[in-house]
Amino acid sequence: MVSLMGTLLFLSLRGLHVLLAAVWVGSMAFTSYLLMPVLQGLGPVGGHVMIGLNSKGMTRFIALISGMTVLTGIYLFWHFTGGFDPEISRSHAGRAFGIGGFAGLIAAIVSRAIVGRSAEKVARIMEQASMVPDGPQKGELMQTATLLRQRVATFSTVVLAFQVIALILMAIGHYV
């Protein structure tokens, strides 16, 4: 019975890990290649869209998905290596999963620390700018928001690159 429960837990967490990773990678691909270019082209209106996304919890959603992906991945690596056995970790498959996991961890950190925080700052600045009359102060706020949106766009692409590395290494891990 313990073996069956362990197998069911492993398979459930593996399925959850793949599902979470798919949602996370898809979200970042959408953000990098569709959403951010459109928002940058909209100028000040793009900031209002970011306010809406922030109020709906987009940054919290991405943080939750990335965190759960990393945590389930750590469990899967622990399971694969028999409790982080160094010999298994040094195997080709262990290295592929380990490097892929590290790339995923970097993606999660950059996603939250840079992309998420910058997106939240844009939303706060745009809310502030909406209450300021046209003039130099509003211009400075809009310029800051534009720079932060560019940071979100740039680092969303960086996150996606690390996710692709993780995705490829996870896909080939059992076959190397």
Sequence positions of predicted segments:
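Polytopic transmembrane helical bundles with strong interfacial aromatic enrichment
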Residues: 1-176
